[in-house]
């Protein structure tokens, strides 16, 4: 038997799963959410237990949580921690929605082992990850989506193109930061993609219709299962096809009509209620020909949460953490508001350190940071963001 120096307390406690190692697509934005969640739990008198394995993050500082487990974010390590901390049956549950995609993938093993997930259920998380079932749900709700298909080889992809047509967006399933995602315009490019080292045997490949010239929109919201607060509707400055982590965006949106904004709010609330979301939800939309398409739904905090929090002056991660412990949204009297000042987020790229890298932006994420510009004039807000990003 291994030695265990853990001194388990009798206090009510919650385990927060962090984002793990920094990499393109999963960085410090998620750590921001974890840190503010820990502070929020402490204020409620709940013991906060952080599980993370990145010494460069703030969440692993000694004074952020009541207890820190510096362990890898895999099912074996996390389940062992849950077992150790729940000896007195005082563990309220585990928060998986603040650390990006990594902790979200552990939710199935946690549920199978009888560990409670705080917030959105695994059933809803799994539904969002399952492309076929999610597409069926969108069809049932009469919500538009780009045409899509799931294939396993080049032969199946050729058949799928008959109904989807070029150009398409293609990517392996279960990837982060748009890794190995490409925009394909013809059969030659499609064949080259399947002959590349992106393809892993027996793993599914996702094909989506590429909406040429569409505007991309990011929406962050919080729900308690009944009430929904839409904290921000962000309009991307680059057109759809550039990864959301690489695209500059504006809050409030610049070119969307009141009709489109109302439709985005309606769909966001409909999806949140249907999935019984508790905590964060992020939805990515595409707008083309005055039609609203749902690209993706993430039942977790997104990388834009810190930006929206600072732009609106609302501590979203703190509020969401309290929702996860049973507090109702009505307590905060939150309402969607349009700021008099403009906030513009701009991505920071490492091209000066990697001069041979491809400078053209696409669906695979390349940025390693972000900045924001604030001003009452939209043009000045953009200018400030460009100066901050050293562009």
Question: Which sequence ranges carry the predicted segments?
Answer:
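A conserved helix-loop-beta module that forms one wall/lid of the active-site cleft
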Residues: 120-181
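Hydrophobic/aromatic ligand-binding patch that stacks against planar heteroaromatic rings
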Residues: 40, 109, 137, 160, ...
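N-terminal Rossmann-like NAD(P) cofactor-binding module of classical short-chain dehydrogenase/reductase
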Residues: 95
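Short glycine-/small-residue-rich flexible loop motifs, especially phosphate/cofactor-binding loops
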Residues: 38, 107, 135, 158, ...
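A short helix-to-beta-strand connector/capping loop
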Residues: 65, 113, 143-146
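ATP-dependent carboxylate activation and anion-phosphoryl transfer catalytic cores
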Residues: 1-12, 17-24, 31-92, 101-104, ...
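Glycine-rich phosphate-binding loop
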Residues: 98
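Short Gly/Thr/Asp-enriched flexible loops that form oxyanion-binding sites at enzyme active sites
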Residues: 101-114
